[in-house]
C-alpha cells in the first residue's frame, strides 16, 4: 500500500524548492530557442489532443525533480489503489469510483455483492433506453405528442458539468445532425432562474430531470416544486413530465411521481459525475446515447494515459506536477483557464468547482493542518472575450497567474468568412498564439506604463476540433490533474465540508432560529 505523507516531509520536494526561479521563461521562449521548446515540450493526449508546456518555467532539471516527486509521493500507486476500490475519501469513508463509470482500469470492485462497473454500465444503458424511447415517440406527453425540450433541475455538480458539456457539443451536434432535443437547466434557488427557463419552453412538450443524490437537496426540491406548480397550472400531470436521477435509497427512488429513476451512488461525487449516468440522461436525450458513449470513450482513453509512471508520457500527471511547482515553489496564487472556443464558455466554471471544491482544503486527509498552500483560485473565460476583460491584470498586474489555454484548429459549425486574408477561426487561433508569446516574452518599453515584463507561464491543449471524444479526454485530463495534485498535497479531494456550514445556517434562518449577527442579517433581508 502507498504511504500518505504531507508534501513538506518529502525529500524530493525540498530539492524542488531549491529550483525557484530556475527558468527565465522570457529568455527561454525568445527566438529560435523558443521555437525548439515548442517542438520539444509536448505530450500526446487521448482523442487527438496534445498538451504543450513549452511556455512553462521548466527544463530538464525541473522535470527531473518533478519526476522524483511523483515517485516519492507514489502517485501512480495511489491512483491504482483508487481505481481498485480503496477507501480514498477518508472524510466520508467512501471509495472513489468515477473512473469506473467510463472504463475498468484494474480489478473488479464489488460492494455488497454488486459489481460496480456493471452497475454504472446498467444505469447508462437505462438512460440510453429511456432516451431512445423518447426520441422514437414511445414515451410521450399526455396527448401522445413527442417531447421537444429537456430541462435538468439540479445544482453544483448536477448542473455545472452537464451544462458545460451540453453547451460544448450543441453546435457540433447541429453540424453532425445529432441534435435530438433542446436542453435547458434550472439550478439557482433564485425564483427568477426557474421562471425565466419555464417562460422559454413549451411546458406541454417539456421533459424535466430532477437530479439529487440524496433526494433532499434544498435548492433542487424547491425548484422541482416550482416546476410542478407551473405544470399543474398549465393543466398538465407532473408525473408524466418528470424523471429522477438519484440514489437507490433516496425518497425519489421509488416515488410514483416520475416516469423512471436512474440511479447513482455515493462513490461518485457530484463534481466528478459528468461522465456517469447523471449527465448521461440529459446528454443522451439531447444528442443521442451514441454521442454520450463517445464522450465516455474519450475520457476512458485519457484515464489509461494517466496510469503511466513516466511523467513525460502522462499529460495529466505532468500538468498536476507543474501546477504544484507553480503553487508551492513559485508562489503563484491562481490559475486561469482560457479556452479559445465559445463552445467551452462554461468549462471554466465547471473546472472551478471541480478544482476548488476538491483541493480548497487546509487540513490533510487525516484531519491535520498543513503548513503549505494547497489548491489555487481557478477562474476563466473564453477567448478572445477575456482579452478585453481581465487580461490586463494577467499581463501587467503584481501577481503572476499561470494560464491554461485550450484551442482547436477547426470550428464546430464550419461556417466562416474570409476578411482581410484570414477567416474568423484563423483570427481566433492567431490570438491564442500571440497571447502565449506575449505573456512569456513581454515587450520592453521605456514608458513603464507600456512595459511588459513577460515571465507569465502558460500551457496549451490543442486539437483538430472539439468533438465528443476530445471533450471526454479534456474533462478526464483536468479531473485526473486535480486528483494527482490532491495526492501530492495529501488532501482528501473527494469531500466538501465547506459546502455544509452555510446550508445548516440557512435552515436555521428559514426556521427563524437565529440570534446575533445572523438575526440582524435575516431581518435586513426581510426573511
Give residue ranges: language-model regions.
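Flexible, glycine-rich loop/tail regions that form catalytic "lids" or insertion modules at the edges
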Residues: 2-74, 313, 317-329, 344, ...
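Extended, charge-enriched "interface" segments that sit outside catalytic cores
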Residues: 4-143, 421-429, 440-441, 463, ...
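Conserved active-site and cofactor/substrate-binding residues in soluble primary-metabolism enzymes
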Residues: 11, 36, 57, 61, ...
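Glycine-rich phosphate-binding loops that contact phosphosugars or nucleotide phosphates
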Residues: 129-137, 143-309, 508
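Short glycine-rich or small-residue beta-strand-to-loop segments that form or flank ligand, phosphate
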Residues: 148-156, 208-214, 334-341, 378, ...
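Active-site phosphate/pyrophosphate-binding segments
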Residues: 230-415, 454, 501-527
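Acidic, Ser/Thr-rich peripheral helices and adjacent loops at domain boundaries
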Residues: 415-450
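C-terminal structured subdomain/cap of oxidoreductase catalytic cores
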Residues: 450, 466-518
